[in-house]
Amino acid sequence: MSQTDGRITMAINQKLTNIIEGRVVKSCREGASEVQIRFQDGSTMMVKVMESNSPPLREGSQVRRVHENGTELMIDSEDGTTLSLQLIEPGNSISVRDKDGAAEYLG
């Protein structure tokens, strides 16, 4: 994490960004320990969380990039909204599966 112009910036998770960039959110549901994001292409992202610090991503928003630093995960969308989450276990809290259930990302 670095600080620029008074704002804290986090490293981009390039692998995850490359997988979900451009996908359009169909729904975003936040539970007590898990956030589920369904995309219009039928894929699903599950994130095990300690807490969510922001409102869910809006239906129809398009993913721009994903930032990660330790337990912090931020998903930016093209409409300017950001989903900010605290991961339960870095490296073992995120899964993305395609419409057939095949793993695209585990980390």
For each predicted feature, which ranges?
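Surface-exposed, interaction-prone regions used to assemble/regulate multi-protein complexes
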Residues: S2-G107
